[in-house]
Regions:
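A metal-dependent hydrolase metal-coordination microenvironment
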Residues: 22-198, 206, 214-231
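Bacterial N-terminal signal peptides that target proteins for export
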Residues: 1-7
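Hydrophobic h-region of N-terminal signal peptides that target proteins for export
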Residues: 10-19
């Protein structure tokens, strides 16, 4: 398992005039994390796994951050640890991996999206999209909204309630899309995480049509319970 949080989405890109035989399905992941936030592997290693396992698209959506700028981390004291670094170095080599020891501390630089995208994307078969998990909350309830193909990082917007918090974050995404012309879309992640979001909260939203039905993290409660609907319902 590449990260603690794994979502696999498959969808068909087909016009309404196409027959069922003409429909083509594309498989990808829009919600996964790297060492840029709380994931346990390097972005290139994550992209390499998906590319090598028949996926067509990937968006690494770290919490409230884009993979840009200088970011050096402790080589051993991170979620992946020395084992992840050893695999990373073996796969990509010293010519690619930036690492050094500063005052006795082993450090490694996380590659930016602008650096790893040209190396890992394959035109026509494997698409990489810059993404962010906009991670907000209301009174301790986690409200996380994925933004796929984002252009500029968006900070959490806050709000006066669960639905209001979601709406303000969605509005920020839609405003960026309109201002930049960049194709992008938001979707609600793991609504049952922390029992934070009710169906009535999502029904009220404007400009939002998608939510995450399945998430592989053990705490997201995909299947609900006696008092809460499953995400499939």
């Amino acid at each position: 398992m590449i990260t603690k949080t794994l979502l696999t989405i498959a969808f068909a890109l087909a016009a309404t005039t196409l027959s069922a035989e003409d429909t083509r399905w594309w498989k990808g992941n829009l919600h996964t994390h790297s060492l840029w936030s709380d994931g346990d592997d390097y972005p290139e290693m994550i992209a390499d796994w998906y590319r090598s396992n028949g996926y067509h698209f990937l968006g690494i959506s770290d919490h409230n951050v884009l993979a840009e700028g200088q970011r050096w981390i402790h080589r051993e004291k991170n979620a992946g640890g020395q084992r992840a670094f050893d695999k990373y170095l073996k796969r990509f080599g010293d010519d690619w991996v930036d690492h050094k020891v500063v005052k006795g501390v082993p450090r490694v630089r996380l590659k930016t999206y602008a650096e790893y995208r040209p190396k890992m994307a394959v035109p026509g078969s494997f698409l990489l999209m810059q993404s962010e998990e906009l991670s907000d909350q209301f009174q301790g309830r986690p409200i996380h909204i994925n933004v796929t193909n984002i252009k500029k990082q968006i900070p959490p917007q806050g709000g006066a309630g669960v639905a209001a918090t979601m709406q303000k974050n969605i509005d920020a995404v839609l405003a960026q899309r309109k201002a930049t012309g960049q194709p992008m879309f938001p979707h609600i992640n793991h609504p049952n995480f922390g029992w934070a979001i009710q169906p009535a909260d999502m029904i009220r939203l404007r400009g939002e049509r998608f939510f995450e039905v399945y998430n592989g993290h053990p705490a997201v409660r995909n299947y609900g319970d006696s008092k809460h609907l499953s995400t499939g319902q």
